[in-house]
Amino acid sequence: DGRRIPFTPLFTALALRRSKMMLADGAYFSLRHPALDRLRDLIDEAVEMSEWETGPKISRYQLALWSDFEDLADESEAAVSWRAAAHTLQDVERVPETIVPDSVRATLRPYQKHGVSWLCFLAVHRLGGILADDMGLGKTLQVLAALAARREDAGGRPALVIAPTSVIGTWQEESAAFVPDLRVAVVSSTGGLAAVGEADVVVTSYAVLRLDETAFAEREWGWLILDEAQFVKNPATRIHRAVAALRAEVRFALSGTPFENSLIELHALLSITSPGLFPSARRFRDEYVGPIEKGKVPDNVEGGAYRRARLEKLRRRVRPLMLRRTKAQVAADLPPRQEQVLHVELSDAHRAVYDIALQRERQKILGLLDDLDRNRFIVFRSLTLLRMLSLAPRLIDPEASGDSSKLDALVAQLEEVIAEGRRALVFSQFTSFLDLSELALGRAGIGFTRLDGSTADRSGVVSAFRAGETPVFLISLKAGGFGLNLTDADVVILLDPWWNPAAEAQAVDRAHRLGQTRPVMVYRLIASDTIEDKVRALQQRKARLFGAVLDDDDLFARSLDASDIRGLLEA
């Protein structure tokens, strides 16, 4: 009837689940009107992280959500005071430009300049976030440039960078090359923090932090930077708790793969960088992981529409606090990357050994899947045995006779690569298979360098390969899947598939990254009619889940569960 409804009393009445409210003229207004359904849904979302004792409040992490309330209200006193901040935070593409100081001795690309502005913008508002650019797009340089730009505002508190041990050298090298004015100190052992003098940036490893967490927790830090942040994706681990306990003005996570297996890993990162953005992990599982990954929906609700709604709500909340650019979007001048799957047929003797093991392990596993949580270790041990048998029987039985068809395929492929004057990175998850690869390459007269977790002089072997001493670099997936710049190679060979595609993508991006001037060829060696075929299909489902949440796909998938494992064991 044209009467104006004040927003704040309406907001409070809906939040308190009232069916009607009294207007200024004494008349009652029904709150069951369909026009209020959208507002009621938004309040249900906001109540998860708001307090109502002193009136409606919304954390500054929910400003994108607050903009939805603004859309529904004609007037809101609270919205007036929050409008300027909400306008900027709800669309991070409009962040004010930060001028990269002359002390940064690098020419940043436009997307990198925007990354610097985004980091500085969130820091000014004391909001953390996730820089989720594709691997190889220069996340380290963007952070260093942002630290240089905000150096005068640090207030004497150094930034703390936590990274895998293998990546610490990269921070040292890039800071010395690009921001030499920044005073960078490396803490490489327990007790080392006490010896740090005046520094702008302190760099340490996750291992040192875990062993010396009390000393780090006692300090007050400016920026906290988590490089390769997937290291803290499990909230049940000691390292996650140690990182969460650190006192910092603002926290940023760097990872091209902010989750690899499940959305709960994304929640674990955001609980550090943006605490309060989402409800508890339990509710996050119920409200997002269940519908999006596993298709769990309430009764009498159309499943597809409900999953899409939950996915869009997740995207909307995450979008202001995550910046992700892919190579296809911002590095059009990067040489192309081609991929080819090479199917390897097992020899008759190898096939006989594999099939016998498959029948035995299949019967064992299928009987355990009804209680996967309790039997997970046994199940994955059996799956790992089948994966190793797909490579070579000798990985399980050193006395086994017969050669490995995959090793034969590797040698043949490398001979062709070397004849063309190219150089190759060869990855395997199993160091024992790298041992067999060494023997095969030695017999073929192919020179190689090797890097795995036991390598003492990591920088030395990397430098030797970069210097051109050998045409082949054998690398374990865990030791060399991140933190290396190996653009000297333009061929990548993946000897065995891993459960999730993110780990393999990180390995490929050792060669296909900024600085590469030649097309990169990726070969995936898959043993035909083995568990490797099934693992490859599982990878594709996980890639769809990643794309559905972080990229603009409308696809849905599930994490690894009992049904996935049954699929791995199908004939």
Predicted regions span which residues?
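ASCE P-loop NTPase motor core, strongest for the SF2 helicase catalytic module
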Residues: E75-N300, A305-R307, K313-A571
